[in-house]
């Protein structure tokens, strides 16, 4: 994907997360927000790494040759958000990374079991996630902004 397309998708995923969270007819708010927010942050960091010329695809070495890992449908496997955050070149500060890793943990719970009503207990983390996303995608002094 092109860097610009990744940025657009990142922004739209976060906007969708906020819109769904604020919809009074939706009860699956936090879970949906977290899933879309993780996609948004992943695309944002993929755009950053692409801009920096950092290969964010999984691979293994076969002799001296680099062999890229692929999905069962033949697409390259790209780093998930936690791997993006753990990269030494990540532009994300430790507080934002900690917030995102907290949400990644909850996303794992969402994926593997039904969650109880969690909206009230994590709403501050969700607000921080969306605000930090806006800051990182638009603030010109941040390294993550793609030029």
Feature map (PLM): residue ranges:
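A structural signal for well-ordered alpha-helices, especially hydrophobic packing surfaces
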Residues: 21, 44-45, 107, 111-114, ...
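Short secondary-structure subsegments characteristic of cysteine-rich extracellular domains
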Residues: 125-135
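Charged alpha-helical initiation segments
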Residues: 1-36
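Active-site-proximal cofactor/substrate-binding loop regions of enzyme domains
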Residues: 25, 35-58
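A broadly used, surface-exposed interaction patch
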Residues: 49-123
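Hydrophobic faces of stable alpha-helices that mediate helix-helix packing
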Residues: 7-15, 100-107, 130
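Single conserved hydrophobic/aromatic residue that forms the stacking wall/gate
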Residues: 135-146
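Short, charged, amphipathic alpha-helical segments
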Residues: 31, 123-124
């Amino acid at each position: 994907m092109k860097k610009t397309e990744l940025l657009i998708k990142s922004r739209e995923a976060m906007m969708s997360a906020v819109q769904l969270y604020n919809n009074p007819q939706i009860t699956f708010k936090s879970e949906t927000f977290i899933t879309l927010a993780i996609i948004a942050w992943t695309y944002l960091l993929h755009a950053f790494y692409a801009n920096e010329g950092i290969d964010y695809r999984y691979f293994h070495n076969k002799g001296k040759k680099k062999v890229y890992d692929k999905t069962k449908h033949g697409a390259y496997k790209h780093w998930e958000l936690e791997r993006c955050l753990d990269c030494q070149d990540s532009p994300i500060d430790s507080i934002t990374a900690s917030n995102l890793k907290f949400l990644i943990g909850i996303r794992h719970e969402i994926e593997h079991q039904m969650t109880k009503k969690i909206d009230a207990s994590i709403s501050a983390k969700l607000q921080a996630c969306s605000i930090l996303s806006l800051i990182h995608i638009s603030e010109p002094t941040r390294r993550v902004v793609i030029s």
